[in-house]
């Protein structure tokens, strides 16, 4: 084998090892994401009534980022011990109104 072939072979092995390592890291990240998602789902089942969960699921179809924000707030409240009983659909509606009310409205008036 010539020096050039040896260099090519080493470089190819290096690239294959890098690709394997990246694939393993991506798989580990995906598993971590799935595990966190399952934990979040379990917490939401503990703190929300079925109707409230259904409302969030429907809202997730149109505004996934907004629902993510609400879920994180609910989880934080639960972890701080501020959720005494399951949150009902009516309570969730009020929370959604308060959070959505913070959004700025931009009005354009034409002359």
UniProtKB/Swiss-Prot annotation:
One of its GO terms (molecular function) is DNA binding. Keywords: DNA-binding. InterPro entries: DNA_bind_arc, PDCD5-like, PDCD5-like_sf. It comes from the Archaea. It holds the Pfam family dsDNA_bind. The keyword RNA-binding does not apply. The keyword Cell cycle does not apply. Transmembrane segments: none annotated. One of its GO terms (cellular component) is cytosol. HAMAP family: dsDNA_bind. Belongs to the PDCD5 family. DNA-binding protein which can interact with a randomly chosen 20-mer of double-stranded DNA. This is DNA-binding protein MTH_1615.
